């Protein structure tokens, strides 16, 4: 009887401890500064879903005394939310970082360079079209995006720069582009990204004439934080927690950890096999050192110059912009492309470097 009573008392004590523990945790969460990260479905960004699902993000957020919410958006909506300052950080390409927040005057900082497209984006054709015969033919794509950038780079690298003005572009949403292209055999060319590319080339009459592996490092996938957030002590804790969580997560994805692949694939409604196929054409910077070496290298500036020139030529840097230098970019070595008084996009490798040095 005595042992049973002690058991009941012990159980009650444990229950109270659990309840008080939960209460303390809830109180701590309520008191913690909260930050929100936006992401959209893409091979290099799907791991943010797993990061949250697995508890990896919470573990690092707790270490730094912050609370981090991860919110999924359609890509365009995520950028709009970031520009409107409704979220603190957002996954986006280098081009969108320049022509959305930076062009809107929102000073932004890339703290994680996660990967670059190494074949995920492609120019696909029927009827044996080439870059020489492409001008004048209807080309389906999402205009003013990396798809149009890829198409123009393909034209230039194949000696067709003088024909750029003759391209006949059909603006088509990514939600409609696969069906619109495949269901009408008179459509001869399309530019898009995986997994849409994989769905289209399943039709054996379609093949790729150019993809992003031909322009390595030019289409980068970033985690961008508003600089005003990063300039606060809590914002820096947030950046440290997010960076640490990212590298723990991406190493699990890269090494094929079962749940990491399962949830990363599920994030975009893909099978694990389809997701693995997308990863093959995504140049992931799995180690922080590889990301730091890339970000700190002079090659990044050359690639970003191509992107900013494209954005300026197409009027993507905002109203009243009369020079490509009016929306400037700063780099980790202190170099600035453009007017130093008008820096709107910054590459900051400090957090990746801290991860490399084991200081997070």
Pin down the residues of each PLM region:
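Bacterial N-terminal signal peptides that target proteins for export
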Residues: 1-12
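Bacterial N-terminal signal peptides
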Residues: 10-21
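Signal peptide processing junction and immediate N-terminal pro/mature segment
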Residues: 22-29
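Short, glycine-/small- and polar/acidic-enriched structural segments
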Residues: 29-171, 180, 188-194, 217, ...
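Predominant activation on well-ordered alpha-helical scaffold segments within soluble catalytic domains
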Residues: 49, 98, 152, 198, ...
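Pocket-lining segment of extracytoplasmic ligand-binding domains
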Residues: 96, 163-170, 175-272
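Secondary-structure end/capping motifs
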Residues: 231-320
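Conserved C-terminal helix/tail region of periplasmic/extracytoplasmic solute-binding proteins
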Residues: 308-360
